């Protein structure tokens, strides 16, 4: 009888965590997710999984070592996927101490918990690292041997997490791996991230619910992939014979401007760009008559970071060769369309619900319904 695979996922309520939970459940795993206690219900992405016999949730926090030790001791996982993080680069400038506690020391708390409960030789650990480590890049594209030059408090914290994983692998022989994730998006992406901000704005503008989209540096270059494809690579990393670190990327690069151009195209709006830098604007040249000639995208200095990483481009050669992973399962164009289609439906649904509420309020005021 084969041993039951037991996965513990931190950050299970996030974009990656929810997709990874689905993948592992489909592979027959017992999946245990770690969630934080909160007065706000943030479990929308995993609501469809709750109630399944092999899906379990536990309360713990990366800032609380005792809670982490308790969960690891109770679950006794064969694999841990540490996806929890303060993952907003901009927020890390506003909350650097919190970012360091979660993204740096939080990683240490997890691997120490594994050692303390006696699972160092039986539990494999995946750490979600980031392309932001490359920061002020010294070469393109970036691979596993490219020097790091972190350019934000978030990246600095993540660099500690990266190196402590390598240290425990070397010092204690633990199966610990870093996945250096380049930007990966989906219809489950948080609405404050630039890609989701763009697709939601395009949908709202197309449906008459928003006038304009404000963005930061349109020239920023990113390697964008589909999160659903990337979680497969996370799993493959822990199935390898030896623990190693891998770049997870598509190997294809696009600008923020290109992402916006394509998103608006998919809602039936064509943009023409005029001006440069902070004075650049996206003007509608084709689409609904009431929008033609209007400026729909503007650059705002408010969205520029104190230090900005402008050229991230990953080389997934190692993951492709050693793991057999296909980084181009979903193309850039397909990714943007998936997100736009989802947000067009979401905005339409929200608009319909708002109309019902307005009509009900009007009927109540007139005494039509009581």
Regions flagged by a language model, labelled:
Residues 1-184, 228, 234, 238, ...:
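N-terminal Rossmann-like NAD(P)+-binding domain of SDR-like oxidoreductases, especially those catalyzing
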Residues 26, 33-34, 60, 189-370:
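C-terminal substrate-binding subdomain of Rossmann-fold SDR/epimerase-dehydratase oxidoreductases
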